[in-house]
């Protein structure tokens, strides 16, 4: 049975405790995930926590940048603060409440701006072993340059990336570069010896959310084993 935990205005929807050794956090703008997280938790043998209620444009932006498309509010660059909130409060409270093991394997799934956040935080810390970035906003100003100059660390886990085949056809110039930008990210990670998997799927940015989430979990938990 799912349960909902509220932490600092964040709504954390938790699946049944399928595993105390594996937990996956999703940063996904869908409030009605109750049925899916229960089914996915059982299928993939992992306890799932879906976090919503974030200031989407700002907490997932790693540094301040002009708004996109032109005329939209600027991004405020609050990712460092949000990461600290996850590390210091959200994750400890969730995992204490769910009685997770002290050495729990922790993964992160994000989409769009939270997919950008998933990769950004993976490059600077080991809070999450593996990540999935679905249609990650790698067009974000300065991100490719940051990846090119950053030290890409050894990662024990893997990164799964997915992009819709219509996303590069956006009328917004910045968004239209996402295909090239994603290719650049994949090349940089592969050159650094990071284990990656990429899938191109039909559709635009937010098409078919549940099938895409299932693809991410299939990549992160390929053995489908139950603890």
Feature map (PLM): residue ranges:
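Cell-envelope and extracellular/periplasmic
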Residues: 22, 28-29, 95-98, 122-123, ...
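Short glycine-enriched nucleophile-adjacent loop
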Residues: 115-125
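The feature captures the conserved acid-bearing segment of alpha/beta-hydrolase catalytic domains
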Residues: 138-221
């Amino acid at each position: 049975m799912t349960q909902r935990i509220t932490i600092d205005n964040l709504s954390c929807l938790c699946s049944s405790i399928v595993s105390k050794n594996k937990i996956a956090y999703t940063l996904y703008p869908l409030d009605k995930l109750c049925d899916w997280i229960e089914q996915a938790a059982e299928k993939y043998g992992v306890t799932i926590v879906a976090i919503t209620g974030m200031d989407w444009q700002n907490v997932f932006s790693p540094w301040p940048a002009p708004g996109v498309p032109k005329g939209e509010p600027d991004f405020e660059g609050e990712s460092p603060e949000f990461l600290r909130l996850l590390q210091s409060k959200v994750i400890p409270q969730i995992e204490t409440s769910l009685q997770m093991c002290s050495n729990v394997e922790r993964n992160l799934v994000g989409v769009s701006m939270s997919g950008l956040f998933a990769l950004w935080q993976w490059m600077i810390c080991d809070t999450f072993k593996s990540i999935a970035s679905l249609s990650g906003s790698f067009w974000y100003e300065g991100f490719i340059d940051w990846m090119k100059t950053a030290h890409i660390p050894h990662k024990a886990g893997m990164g799964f990336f997915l992009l819709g085949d219509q996303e590069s056809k956006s009328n917004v110039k910045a968004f239209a570069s996402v295909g090239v930008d994603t290719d650049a990210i994949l090349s940089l990670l592969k050159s650094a010896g990071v284990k990656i998997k990429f899938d191109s799927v039909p559709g635009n940015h937010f098409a078919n959310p549940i099938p895409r989430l299932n693809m991410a979990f299939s990549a992160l938990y390929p053995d489908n084993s139950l603890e």
